[in-house]
Regions:
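Subset-of-secretome marker
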Residues: 23-353
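Bacterial N-terminal signal peptides that target proteins for export
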Residues: 1-9
């Protein structure tokens, strides 16, 4: 059962990596369009963006009955939705992000988190919410997070990626996309879609839409191909400093992967018997300049074990606009009177206990 849920979660996460992309000419194949998308993304220096994420999880009755707290957490997750919007530019490094967590049910609660980040600092506006009973003196102020101070306190380096680092990560994203998409058969997983059939919102201007889809029929070859390309993918991920992977950990992962390969057929047999893919696809819409305008992800898996069935569902969307234009920001760096330092907030919390 653990193998089934772990592998299903892995598939879910890998599909999530497809929430980025771009394209080029209409003559290109669908796979070529997605591979070129990451190459084009290295050219992005500024943009507006927005998106949303919604989970839908259903655990077997026996799991919920054994642990009532699990049912409470599950209910909260299923009644919650995350949405976000923001603006970003590389040079000078500046990003603003407006996060909203909406929890519905008997009572609707919305938590809003405005965030502003520059190269060496970040400010988060402290919300007034029953989920976080914070001191009254801190409500409405901006919590200042100085990356150098946090690094000293934690003993680990904490930084906001510089423009050069962000461009490096964009390049790595392109290389990872080439490896990932290149591992899969063109006709089995990729297709061009119309804007209407793909469910792209009306306000998205797009010339091309590409769909990447997993089904019960192509799931086995997907995992088999993934096993082949995973070592190279891990090498690329290890190049990202923030991933924190040492060479020893990379080699250990590769060894474990190789050792588990002998059990792969049996694991896939078990999955094919116990997992149903109702839907697992991502659609990427590309604008006239070859940049991603919209990406949508939808996953719905049913997993059965010992006569009980659970569900894993995820809907996500990401949209960007005003790419490489002169973008306007809504937030400004807060004045000293509006700021509370991290240590000050900790002191207020401890004093109030």
């Amino acid at each position: 059962m653990k193998k089934i849920w772990a592998l299903a979660a892995t598939v879910l996460l890998l599909l999530g990596t497809l929430l980025v992309g771009c394209s080029q000419e209409s003559k290109a194949t669908p796979k070529d369009i997605l591979i070129e998308a990451y190459g084009k993304s290295t050219e992005i220096t500024s943009a507006k963006f927005e998106g949303s994420i919604k989970l839908n999880l259903g655990l077997p009755d026996s799991v919920i009955q054994e642990d009532p707290s699990t049912a409470m957490v599950l209910n909260m997750l299923n009644n919650a939705a995350l949405s976000f919007r923001g603006t970003t530019q590389l040079d000078p490094a500046l990003t603003e992000l407006f996060l909203t967590i909406l929890v519905t049910g008997d009572t609707e609660i919305a938590i809003h988190l405005p965030i502003l980040a520059i190269e060496d600092k970040m400010w988060v506006k402290i919300p007034n919410t029953p989920f976080l009973p914070l001191p009254d003196d801190s409500i409405g102020k901006y919590l200042e997070l100085d990356f150098a101070e946090l690094s000293e306190m934690s003993g680990q380096e904490i930084t906001n990626p510089s423009p050069e680092q962000q461009q490096q990560y964009q390049q790595l994203g392109k290389e990872i996309a080439e490896l990932f998409f290149g591992a899969f058969d063109e006709n089995t997983y990729f297709s061009k879609e119309s804007k209407e059939d793909a469910g792209i919102p009306d306000d998205v201007n797009t010339d091309q839409v590409v769909k990447f889809e997993l089904t019960d029929d192509n799931f086995r070859p997907f995992i088999e191909s993934l096993y082949v390309v995973l070592p190279a993918l891990i090498d690329k991920v290890a190049e990202i400093k923030e991933a924190g992977l040492t060479q020893a950990e990379v080699e250990e992962f590769k060894a474990e992967l190789q050792a588990s390969e002998q059990d792969l057929d049996a694991t896939l047999d078990e999955l094919e018997q116990n997992m149903t893919i109702h839907k697992a696809s991502t659609v990427t819409a590309v604008d006239k300049n070859g940049f991603v305008a919209y990406t949508g992800l939808e996953v719905d898996l049913a997993i059965t074990s010992e006569g009980e069935t659970g569900r894993i569902g995820l809907q996500a969307a990401f949209k960007q606009s005003e790419i490489n234009e002169k973008v306007e920001f809504e937030l400004q760096q807060p004045d000293a009177s509006e700021v509370i330092k991290f240590q000050e907030l900790m002191s207020l919390i401890l004093y109030g206990l």
